[in-house]
Every structure is written in C-alpha cells, then in structure tokens.
From Swiss-Prot:
Signal sequence residues: none
Keywords of this entry: Cytoplasm, Isomerase, Manganese, Metal-binding
Reactions it catalyzes: 2-deoxy-alpha-D-ribose 1-phosphate = 2-deoxy-D-ribose 5-phosphate; alpha-D-ribose 1-phosphate = D-ribose 5-phosphate
Family: Belongs to the phosphopentomutase family.
Enzyme superclass (EC): isomerase
Binding site for Mn(2+) 1: D13, D327, H328
Function as written in the Swiss-Prot or TrEMBL entry: Isomerase that catalyzes the conversion of deoxy-ribose 1-phosphate (dRib-1-P) and ribose 1-phosphate (Rib-1-P) to deoxy-ribose 5-phosphate (dRib-5-P) and ribose 5-phosphate (Rib-5-P), respectively.
Pathway terms, separated by semicolons: Carbohydrate degradation; 2-deoxy-D-ribose 1-phosphate degradation; D-glyceraldehyde 3-phosphate and acetaldehyde from 2-deoxy-alpha-D-ribose 1-phosphate: step 1/2
Protein name: Phosphopentomutase
Binding site for Mn(2+) 2: D286, H291, H339
Cofactor note: Binds 2 manganese ions.
Length: 394
C-alpha cells in the first residue's frame, strides 16, 4: 500500500540557499541566492514557506524560524559535477552525472564552428549569447543575403541555429542541427540541447516560426520516472520538465507560459484523480531574474509564488505529499550571469502530518527525492539516493 497516493514535486528553478561545500571549485564562494535577495528586499515576505519551515533551515532577513513548522525541512547538497538545470533534475530523479554540461558565455570555440562550417558548407555568423529576437534584428538581413547560419547561445547549455525558411529550407536546417548535435556529444562541447530556430519575414519584421525543433540528450540512464511509468503510475510533467528529461518517463505533459501559469496548472493537477507523481518546474526565477542579475524582480517573484501556496494547501488531501526544492542556485548579486553552486532547500508537507514536522538530516545528494518517490510507490530504487519516506510521520 502506498503511503501517499499522489506526490506533488515543485522545483523552484535556481532558488539556492547558500554556498555548497565545493562552491570554490565552481567560482561560487559566497553565493547565497535566497539570503542575498532577502537582504536586497530588506526582508522577504514568504509567510507560507516560513510556515512550512523555510526559516528553520536557515534564518534570513524576513524569514524566521517557527516554533512548530507544518512540514519537514532540511537542505540538500548536489553530488554531480555540474550546476545546470539538466544535471540538477536528473540527479533529483536518481542519476549521478559526472560530465557537466558546458555553457559558452563567450561563444563557441573556433574549432567547433570550423568543423560545423566544413560539414554544412555554410558560413557561421553571430556566435555569442543573445536573445532570439535581438539576434534576428541584428543579423537576420545578413543571414538572408549570404545564406550563413546564425549560431548563438544563452546562459543555459544550448546551441541554437537560426535561418530564414526561404533561404535555408527546413529539411536542411534540421540536418544541420543533427550534425551540430553529433559534434556536441564530445565532452568539451557537450551542450544539453541543440535547437533549430527557423524564422520568416523581412528585415525589421522577422518572426520565429513554430517549426522550432529541439535535439536534446536523453538522460544517461533510467530515472525513477521511467520506473513509475513502466509500473502504470501517472507522471504529469508541468513546465519544462518533459523537455529536461526529453519525454522519458512522462505520461502527460502540460506546458506553461510563466510561474503563475505553472501554479495554475499545479492547482489543476490537484483537482485531478491520479496515482503517481506531479512534477512542476518554475523557470522564471532562473530565466527572468537569476541570469539577468535582477534581485528585485527575483524577490517579487518569490513573494508572488508564496502567495499562491494557500490554494495548494487547501486542495492537498490526507494521502498527498508536497515536496518543494530547487535544482541549483543563481544568485542575482553574484558576479557573472551563470548558475551558482549552492545547497537547495527541501520542504516536505502532507495534511496527514498532524504533529507538524521537524528537521530531517542533511541530504548528501538530490537523489534522495527520487529514492523517496520510488519507495513510496514500490518501484525499483535508483542506484543513488537514500529515501526519507519513513522519517515522515503521520
């Protein structure tokens, strides 16, 4: 008999809670995503996360300890060697990744682009981090006139290739992206995904078409999600979860436009009758505020998210479990624009916890979540991770 019929896992993308013991190896000494935001805001107002026990993990400005937290609380340390979204999420579901995905804040190495030019017969322009719309404004006309490929990246581990559909036919663009995917399987160039970014229109009025295609990497092994799906449990992926695992172990995928849309979809799944896992990623914290080093916007987004939690609490049933965590840090007052190597919070709550919660031992790997989910549903345990299911008392 499953202890919990439904587990709702929420990943607050990039919401770290202080430098990890190995932060120095990543250039991240002193990073502290929530702590620095709380200082910048002169106190974060997150009363619902505080009730669950956020301030019991660590007190921060505006976030204090409570006498009787509703949930169990601790922090988790990442075991894998990367600090990107895919590594964090794959570890959460029981994998250990010893090859970090590469990011290219200065653009891609010349050797890689030379090889891509040689294999595709087309010249490459761009080669820098940029927003898709900005790079089209800047280089779209040149691309049309020369037939070159616009190659660009972002703060994430991606290689994107943009071309006008009337200049480089879709079939050719997709073939080019497959070549780029092959080349970036090399460890030193390993990106999480290659993305075809076709566009149409005239200079000054370019638009990206829906013919985007992603060439992702499948997880390097089976995850707890695969085990759940193969045992006929539901795995409802909300936000970019399905993309992160390249659809592996997903039974239903719900796209989201924003954090608030993500919370709406979470409430929708709370209203659904299912047995298994609902897995939500809230990406705005990372994409809109962390990489852009905007502590004010980040703080406001955290407060908006917190204000939605009562709707979630209200709909949770006695045999539901809510797990809230993060996948890495992205301290908006830290130097650079990259993720930061931090501990992440872990909060666990069910309405059946009548006595309230208490501190759990520090988790040595994010995979403890996957192990807990696996044990609850009686599926094969991941190779990594220690379940804390039996420590959650009703």
């Amino acid at each position: 008999m499953n202890k919990y019929k439904r587990i709702f896992l929420v990943v607050m993308d990039s919401v770290g809670i202080g430098e990890a013991p190995d932060a120095e190896q990543f250039g991240d000494l002193g990073s502290d995503t929530i702590g620095h935001i709380a200082e910048h805001m002169n106190g974060l107002q997150m009363p619902n996360m505080v009730k669950l026990g956020l301030g019991n993990i660590r007190e921060m400005k505006g976030i204090s300890k409570v006498e009787k937290p509703l949930g169990y609380y601790t922090k988790m340390q990442e075991k894998s060697t990367g600090k990107d979204t895919m590594t964090g999420h794959w570890e959460i579901m029981g994998l250990y990744i010893d090859t970090p995905f590469q990011v290219f804040p200065e653009g891609f190495p010349k050797e890689l682009l030379d090889e891509l030019e040689e294999k595709t017969g087309r010249k490459i322009i761009g080669n820098k981090p940029a927003s898709g719309t900005e790079i089209l404004d800047e280089l779209g006309q040149e691309q049309m006139e020369t037939g070159s490929l616009i190659v660009y990246t972002s703060a994430d581990s991606v290689l994107q290739i943009a071309a006008h559909e009337e200049v480089v036919p879709l079939d050719e663009l997709y073939k080019i992206c497959k070549i780029a995917r092959e080349l970036t399987l090399d460890e030193k160039y390993m990106v999480g995904r290659v993305i075809a970014r076709p566009f149409v229109g005239e200079p000054g009025n370019f638009t990206r078409t829906p013919n985007r295609h992603d060439y992702a990497l499948k997880p390097f092994g089976r995850t707890v999600m695969n085990e759940l799906k193969d045992s006929d449990y539901d795995v409802i992926a909300i936000g970019k979860i399905s993309d992160i695992y390249d659809g592996e172990g997903v039974t239903e995928s719900l796209r989201t436009k924003s954090n608030m849309d993500g919370m709406d979809k979470l409430v929708d799944t709370l209203n659904m009758d299912f047995t298994g896992l609902s897995f939500l990623n809230l990406v705005d914290f990372d994409a809109l505020f962390g990489h852009r080093r905007d502590p004010q916007g980040y703080g406001e987004a955290l407060q908006e998210y917190d204000a939605r939690l009562p709707e979630v609490f209200e709909k949770l049933k006695e045999d539901d479990l809510l797990l809230i965590t993060a996948d890495h840090g992205n301290d908006p007052v830290h130097h650079g624009t990259d993720h930061t190597r931090e501990y992440v919070p872990l909060l666990a709550y069910s309405p059946s916890m009548k006595e309230g919660g208490k501190e759990l031992p520090l988790r040595q790997t994010f995979a403890d979540i996957g192990a807990t989910v696996a044990e609850n549903f009686g599926v094969k345990m991941p190779e990594y991770g220690t379940s804390f299911l039996n420590e959650l008392k009703k």
